Amino acid sequence: GGGAFFDQGLPMVDLAMWLADFPAPLRVWAHMDRPRGTAVEESALVTLECESGIAFTFDISWAYVGYEERWWFETLSSRGSARLAPLRVVKELNGKPTDVSPGGAATRENSFNQSYRAELAHFLSVVREETPYEAPSDQVILHKVIEAAYKSADEGKEVKL
């Protein structure tokens, strides 16, 4: 198995790359903390730079010491920002930051569970040939980034892709 980055970071890198429409990765820099006597990392800090000036930073840890567990995903741009857990969207309107978070009808099922239900429905639709199969080219890019992050951490330097 992998450490914290492979376990928790891979889905975050996948989400970030997907939201950005899988831009071509250019370079990766990573630092991973592997306590003595262990083969896997407890924490990782990874920076990924892609084409078009898009950059991502991932801070992943199994060893967070604090009062409560923290998880968030945030995207920033010159026109606004968005954050998950809970969803919050801020956009500049009339020169001021304005909360434009979508409100919706409350449901009995949370968004996390809804996402799994949607993923399963999509999978079944592909198996039944109701939806075209998508080639895994995005996942090949994702795994090249993950591999480059581990190589960067091992060698202590940036890895160009």
Question: What are the language-model segments listed below?
Answer:
Residues 24, 52-54, 78-81, 157:
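Short acidic/polar mixed-charge low-complexity motifs
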Residues 107-121:
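Active-site loop of classical SDR/Rossmann-like NAD(P)-dependent oxidoreductases
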Residues 1-55, 61-66, 70:
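Rossmann-like dinucleotide-binding domain that binds NAD(P)(H)
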Residues 57-60, 84-86:
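Beta-strand scaffold of nucleotide-dependent catalytic cores
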Residues 51, 122-161:
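C-terminal helix-rich "cap/oligomerization" subdomain common to oxidoreductases
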Residues 12-13, 117-121, 146-147:
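A general structural signal for well-ordered alpha-helical segments in protein cores
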Residues 49, 66-70, 76-86, 117-118:
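C-terminal substrate-binding/catalytic lobe of Rossmann-fold NAD(P)-dependent oxidoreductases
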Residues 73, 87-100:
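Short polybasic amphipathic segments
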